């Protein structure tokens, strides 16, 4: 696998970019998660960043990448509506793993947004998408720009939802390389990694949550529900960060 030219790839149409990365992805599929991280750090350009929602399995990718690249900026987009347990989990993992946490927020406070737009999450798909654009997408775009990111690590897994089922290890999103080291992990592999390294699930895991985002758009799992139905009232799975 040769060193990839980000600028040249960004000049290509999306379909051609996918084709240009196909051979590299075929090789990365054969590597384990640690090998993928090491390959990316050796072959892809910096600056490097890692994003995390500090959700149910967040400790895995935070530990995996941070142990190889200590002090890598960890981007959190904070909506102001996270669960209290999530904020506590953020503090706990930041201290335990000595994370270089970078918190980004919308330019408008949560209260100001409600005054201007009402409760966007109660306004159907269009409202949810506007909410996500304001609170997730714009802050992430700003983070990538301010941190001069060229390679972005994230902890997505194909098993999590249909929208992630066919994601490759390596892609280009928002003009930067995006690397998904644990994309092919199942729940058992996640559990084993957490156990091996003395790490915990998000505190709400024990209360029946399979996925955790904002308080107003997250539901406990109930028998018969798919994991993606626990977020955004089942109207959509992605918050916008990992789309486009």
UniProtKB/Swiss-Prot annotation:
Signal peptide: none annotated. GO terms for biological process: hydrogen sulfide biosynthetic process; sulfate assimilation, phosphoadenylyl sulfate reduction by phosphoadenylyl-sulfate reductase (thioredoxin). Pfam families: PAPS_reduct. Pathway: Sulfur metabolism; hydrogen sulfide biosynthesis; sulfite from sulfate: step 3/3. GO terms for molecular function: phosphoadenylyl-sulfate reductase (thioredoxin) activity. One of its GO terms (cellular component) is cytoplasm. Its main location: cytoplasm. InterPro entries: PAPS/APS_Rdtase, PAPS_reduct_dom, PAPS_reductase_CysH, Rossmann-like_a/b/a_fold. Keywords: Cytoplasm, Oxidoreductase. The active site is at residue 239. It comes from the Bacteria. CDD domains: PAPS_reductase. NCBIfam families: cysH, PAPS_reductase, PRK02090.1. Catalyzes the formation of sulfite from phosphoadenosine 5'-phosphosulfate (PAPS) using thioredoxin as an electron donor. Belongs to the PAPS reductase family. CysH subfamily. This is Phosphoadenosine 5'-phosphosulfate reductase.
């Amino acid at each position: 696998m040769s060193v990839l030219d980000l600028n040249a790839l960004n000049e290509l149409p999306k379909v051609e970019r996918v084709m240009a990365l196909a051979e590299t992805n075929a090789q990365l599929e054969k590597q384990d998660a640690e090998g993928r991280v090491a390959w990316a750090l050796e072959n892809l350009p910096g600056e490097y960043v890692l994003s995390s929602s500090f959700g149910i399995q967040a400790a895995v990718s935070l530990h995996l990448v941070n142990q190889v690249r200590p002090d890598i900026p960890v981007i959190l987009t904070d909506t102001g509506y996270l669960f209290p347990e999530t904020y506590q989990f953020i503090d706990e993992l930041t201290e335990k793993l000595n994370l270089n946490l970078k918190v980004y927020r919308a330019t408008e406070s949560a209260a100001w947004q409600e005054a201007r737009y009402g409760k966007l999450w109660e306004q159907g798909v269009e409202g949810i998408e506007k909410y996500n654009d304001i609170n997730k997408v714009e802050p992430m775009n700003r983070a990538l720009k301010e941190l001069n990111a060229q390679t972005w690590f994230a902890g997505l897994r194909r098993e999590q939802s249909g929208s992630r089922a066919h994601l490759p290890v390596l892609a280009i999103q928002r003009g930067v390389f995006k690397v998904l080291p644990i994309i092919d992990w199942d729940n058992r592999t996640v559990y084993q990694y957490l156990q091996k390294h003395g790490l915990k699930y998000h505190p709400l895991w024990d209360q029946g949550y399979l996925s955790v985002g904002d308080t107003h758009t997250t539901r406990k799992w109930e028998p018969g529900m798919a994991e993606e139905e626990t977020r955004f009232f089942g109207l959509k799975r992605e918050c916008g960060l990992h789309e486009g």
